[in-house]
Amino acid sequence: MELVVQSRETDKKSVIKKIRQQGGIPAVLYSGGKSLANIVVDARVFSKFLSTLESGALASTVFTLSYEGREIKALVKDIQYHVTTYDVIHLDFEELVDGRDVRLNIPIRYINTVDCVGVKLGGSLRQVIRCIRVVCKPKDIVPFLELDVQSLGLSQTLKLSDICIPEGIRPVTSLKEVAVTVARR
């Protein structure tokens, strides 16, 4: 996803409020844990993209930020929502540097849920874990990991170790954890 961002100068409440009134989202770009720049993202463009995004996939979505003539690859590290309207009011981006490890949550996509044997026998599919914490290089980031639940019967479970994890991605979460189960109703 490509975003055109503008620079902003101050952290004063009045300026940030004005940015939001003009249809912008105040954001901070970090690199190596340190603040690199205060920026503004177009709220309409970001919200439209967010509405098309699969649930949980924002954490593993790589953005290309066009900032002052440069193309910067970044991940959303934090997002803040308005309490009542649920509008995005602030973003934190982390710059991706080639060769430097990045920690992120990659969502798990459960496939063949309709064809699951246990569900056909009257069971209920319960997703225990929705994402897995990993460490990898920016070039190895994938949007999601898949886990096939078609052969899962009643009262059976699949663990994180059953997920085919691509080379270059090292899980931080214990692979002994239960990812999904089919429970009797």
Swiss-Prot record:
Gene Ontology biological process terms from the UniProt entry = translation
The lineage's top-level taxon is: Bacteria
Keyword Cell membrane applies: no
Q: Name one GO cellular component term.
A: cytosolic large ribosomal subunit
Q: Where are the transmembrane segments?
A: none
User: Example GO molecular function term?
Assistant: 5S rRNA binding
Q: Which InterPro entries match?
A: Rbsml_bL25/Gln-tRNA_synth_N (IPR020056), Ribosomal_bL25/Gln-tRNA_synth (IPR011035), Ribosomal_bL25_b-dom (IPR020057), Ribosomal_bL25_C (IPR037121), Ribosomal_bL25_long (IPR001021), Ribosomal_L25_dom (IPR029751), Ribosomal_uL5_bac-type (IPR020930)
What Gene3D superfamilies does this protein map onto?
Ribosomal protein L25, beta domain, Ribosomal Protein L25, Chain P
The reply to whether Manganese figures as a keyword in the UniProt entry is no
Give the residue range of the signal peptide: none
SUPFAM superfamilies with a match to the protein in the record: Ribosomal protein L25-like
**Alphabetical keyword list:** Ribonucleoprotein, Ribosomal protein, RNA-binding, rRNA-binding
State how it assembles: Part of the 50S ribosomal subunit; part of the 5S rRNA/L5/L18/L25 subcomplex. Contacts the 5S rRNA. Binds to the 5S rRNA independently of L5 and L18.
Which NCBIfam families has this protein been placed in? Answer: bL25_bact_ctc (TIGR00731), PRK05618.1-4 (NF004129)
- Tell me which PANTHER family the record gives: RIBOSOMAL PROTEIN L25/GLN-TRNA SYNTHETASE, ANTI-CODON-BINDING DOMAIN-CONTAINING PROTEIN (PTHR33284), RIBOSOMAL PROTEIN L25_GLN-TRNA SYNTHETASE, ANTI-CODON-BINDING DOMAIN-CONTAINING PROTEIN (PTHR33284:SF1)
Q: Which family does it belong to?
A: Belongs to the bacterial ribosomal protein bL25 family. CTC subfamily.
This chain's function reads:
This is one of the proteins that binds to the 5S RNA in the ribosome where it forms part of the central protuberance.
**Protein name (database record):** Large ribosomal subunit protein bL25
- UniProt lineage: Bacteria, Pseudomonadati, Chlamydiota, Chlamydiia, Chlamydiales
Gene name, Swiss-Prot/TrEMBL: rplY
